[in-house]
């Protein structure tokens, strides 16, 4: 049975897929209770973001169009975006409290906004700089996650720098592989 047979129209399919995406992100984008954050948590968040970006890449590719054509989805998305940015700020505060990042509230706010912009526009960016826009891969998505981690570079504490550097190395994809 085709997925379209279970839904009234394309908007209903998109709404269901967005609900799945929203649920997936809400499940992992939260600060753990009762313990300090670690660099391993940073790895977890970045890998979870990568998996979500890859699995739901089509949502990000056509996001503006999808939101322009569906008022209810646009309202849900705005609430989701606000929740995500609030959760991300709390997570960054946790990394600062754990002496992994040295940041104040203004820096956290700027990093949250810049990270959100990268995450939500990365697929669209890839489609504009590649000769074959449909030629997306998980490796290319990993570079988007790398970009977020790179933004944090100036805030990484000396004690966390070796572990964060190792993570950067693991996530790095050469720009020559991104822009084709």
Question: For each predicted feature, which ranges?
Answer:
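Conserved small/polar residues in nucleotide/adenosyl-binding loops
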Residues: 1-3
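Secondary-structure edge/capping motif, primarily at the C-terminal ends of alpha-helices
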Residues: 29-32, 60-67, 95, 99, ...
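Hydrophobic alpha-helical connector segments
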Residues: 16, 30-59, 75
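Short, hydrophobic secondary-structure boundary micro-motifs
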Residues: 61-64, 76, 104, 164
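Residues within the DNA-recognition helix of helix-turn-helix
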Residues: 6
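Amphipathic alpha-helical segments enriched in hydrophobic/aromatic and basic residues
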Residues: 10-21
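C-terminal peripheral helix-coil segments that are non-catalytic and often amphipathic
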Residues: 124, 128-180
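Amphipathic alpha-helical packing segments from all-alpha helical-bundle domains
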Residues: 72-98, 109-124, 143-154
């Amino acid at each position: 049975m085709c997925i379209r047979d279970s839904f009234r129209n394309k908007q209903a399919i998109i709404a269901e897929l967005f609900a799945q995406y929203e649920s997936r992100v809400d499940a992992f984008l939260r600060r753990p209770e009762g313990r300090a954050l670690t660099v391993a948590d940073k790895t977890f968040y970045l890998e979870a973001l990568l998996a979500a970006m890859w699995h739901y890449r089509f949502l990000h590719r056509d996001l503006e169009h999808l939101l322009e054509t569906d008022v209810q989805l646009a309202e849900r998305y705005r609430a989701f975006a606000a929740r995500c940015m609030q959760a991300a700020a709390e997570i960054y505060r946790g990394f600062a409290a754990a002496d992994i990042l040295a940041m104040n509230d203004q820096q956290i706010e700027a990093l949250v906004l810049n990270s959100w912009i990268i995450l939500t526009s990365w697929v669209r960016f890839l489609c504009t700089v590649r000769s074959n826009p449909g030629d997306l891969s998980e490796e290319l998505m990993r570079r988007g996650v790398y970009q977020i981690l790179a933004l944090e570079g100036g805030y990484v504490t000396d004690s966390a720098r070796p572990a964060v550097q190792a993570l950067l190395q693991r996530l790095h994809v050469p720009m020559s592989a991104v822009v084709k």
